[in-house]
Amino acid sequence: MIPVILGPNDCHYIIDHHHLARALHEEGVKEVLVTIVANLRMVDCDTFWTVLDNRRWMHPFDDKGHRRKYKDIPKSVSGLVDDPFRSLAGELRRLGGFAKDTTPFSEFLWADFLRLRIKRKLVEHDFDRALATAMEFSKSQEAIYLPGWCGPASQD
């Protein structure tokens, strides 16, 4: 199920599983099961976005890690742009680079960490090498603050 917030004008706002929603959309799936996390239909648009942001129900950053204005957030899943560092972080987690965590948008936090350490060109042109580099960084003391970090606790 895809978690959503009910917002102004009875719109459903996806707050997680965006990649799944995008993939289903591209496959032509017309209906999906959702779970309603909160009903904010009664608030005005400005308050709605502020609540989503403060509750960490949104990640208003683009594929380069720059914060977007609320008005620039895609209006549908078809407008979502792939962040190659989010893809790298997802694969890193799948391979054991870090543990699944309940922290909202934890893979985006890892993506931002990796974005500062690995060249985008490497991620886009040699994903396997970028992944190996990401695995090394994921086990480092530099990453200790990130959710799901499972690197060595000591420097042996």
Predicted segments, located by residue:
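Short hydrophobic beta-strand that contains or immediately precedes a catalytic carboxylate
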Residues: 13-16
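Surface-exposed, charge/polar-rich loops and edge strands
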Residues: 1-6, 10-11, 25-156
